Regions:
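Glycine-rich anion-binding loop/nest that anchors nucleotide
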Residues: 56-65, 85, 191-195, 213-282
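Ligand-binding beta-strand-loop-alpha-helix segment within the catalytic cores
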Residues: 115-200
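N-terminal glycine-rich anion-binding loop in soluble enzyme alpha/beta folds
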Residues: 1-42, 46-48
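Short acidic, glycine/serine/threonine-rich loops at helix termini
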Residues: 68-71, 96-102, 201-206, 249-252, ...
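A generic, well-ordered mixed alpha/beta core segment in the N-terminal half of proteins
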Residues: 73-139
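Long, intrinsically disordered low-complexity tandem-repeat segments
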Residues: 368-396
Length: 398
């Protein structure tokens, strides 16, 4: 009897032996269920890194930074395993918070939340943090924005985080290996299309109330990320979770068609998610469904891992590092030039980090920083309001 065409490759049980994480991932790719998908995602990502003229875009959602994943993303930026990051504002806030000396704490989801509130402790499932310390970061961002961003001027979120990253690297005693700091140092753009939905957005709103409105232009964000796709022959996408960042990247292909530009769909697609497709939401939407929209190429390798990203990312990142470090430094990744009216992109091996990182001093106590930043912002606002009142009085007198 002839062997069925469906029975060409047997599964291989994993043997417990001494092996690298990359070898474990390869072995998982020959098993079943989500273990196989995890192994396949490593293989597909590694294949992306071997391609010429390919831009790798990551969507980063969920409370990954407070859950301890921020250094993984920073490492991927530093080694150009990703070339563009689209994130929630909360993940960037928590990254900045830790980069400037704040800490998250091992907690429990069984805690008495009323008692936590009375003690000034915020809970993110089983992670704790001090609310007053968060306020210190709020005031730092607000104070920086009021002193360094032009009132009434529109900035893309990419411009905002590039400037904030420069401040963190060059002016604060901050960790140079955070996400925002690494993105600035290695010229990797960060887009946060829903920045208002975060503590950073709250800080900018308070600055507005103090008479210093800073406008984050969402349409400029859409234009800028579309320019990246326009200037790239092929793109690969990786999604940690889904949400706004996922569709913000996905829709670039739809925009290309509306601009009457060639549309091919993203050439590679990977997602790590706990959402299911049958509820109809975007976070669980399959890549096969995205093909119908022209967002993903029909022939693209597509891997969706239905698993907690706090489990997937540590395994995948270590496996990738072991599997690709021999050629990753030579990878010709996109180098961005935003100096003109239109983005220019060239593909070449990345140069050394552009920013010199100052020697780190001991982190400033968070509560002291909070009070100081609050006073600084209040003084700046008072001085500005006094000047405005004086100008108004002069105008009235004349």
């Amino acid at each position: 009897m002839a062997k069925s065409k469906f029975l060409q490759r047997p599964t291989t049980p994993i043997r417990v032996t001494e092996k690298t994480v990359a070898e474990l991932a390869d072995a998982m790719a020959l098993t079943g269920f989500q273990g196989r998908k995890l192994g396949e995602s490593v293989m597909t990502w590694a294949e992306m890194l071997r391609q010429d003229n390919l831009t790798i875009m990551m969507g980063y959602t969920g409370a990954m930074s407070p859950a301890g994943m921020r250094k993984i993303i920073a490492c991927m930026i530093q080694n150009r395993m990703i070339d563009c990051l689209v994130s929630t504002g909360a993940n960037m806030f928590h990254d900045i918070f830790e980069s400037t000396g704040g800490k998250h704490y091992v907690g429990t989801h069984c805690a008495n939340d009323e008692a936590l509130f009375k003690d000034g402790v915020d809970r993110i499932y089983d992670v704790f943090a001090v609310e007053q310390e968060f306020r210190g970061t709020d005031y730092m961002v607000m104070d920086w924005a009021m002193k360094n961003l032009e009132a009434g001027k529109s900035y893309s979120s990419r411009e905002f985080f590039q400037m904030l990253g420069k401040h963190i690297v060059e002016n604060l005693n901050a960790d140079p290996d955070g996400i925002v700091a690494s993105a600035y140092r290695h010229n990797v753009p960060i887009f946060v299309p829903a920045l208002s939905d975060s503590s950073i957005g709250i800080a900018l709103m308070v600055a507005r109330r103090q008479g210093h409105p800073v406008n984050i232009d969402q349409m400029k964000d859409v234009d800028e990320i579309t320019q990246i796709v326009e200037n790239t022959k092929r793109t690969g996408v990786i999604y940690v979770g889904g949400g706004v960042p996922k569709n913000f990247i996905q829709q670039t292909e739809v925009i290309m068609s509306m601009l009457e530009l060639p549309i091919e769909g993203h050439s590679y697609a990977i997602q790590y998610t706990t959402d299911a497709p049958h509820w109809g939401g975007l976070s669980g939407c399959t890549f096969e469904e995205a093909v119908s929209w022209g967002k993903i190429a029909a022939v693209a390798p597509k891997v969706q891992v239905f698993a907690d990203a706090t489990i997937s990312l540590p395994v995948v990142s270590h496996a990738l590092r072991e599997k690709t470090m021999d050629y990753i430094a030579k990878r010709k990744s996109p180098q961005y030039d935003w100096s003109g009216r239109k983005l220019k992109v060239r593909f070449e091996a990345p140069k050394a980090a552009r920013a010199k990182v100052p020697a780190r001093a001991a982190p400033v106590a968070r509560k002291a920083a909070s009070a100081k930043d609050a006073a600084s912002a209040k003084d700046a606002a008072s001085a500005k309001n006094a000047a405005s009142a004086k100008d108004a009085a002069s105008a009235k007198k004349t």
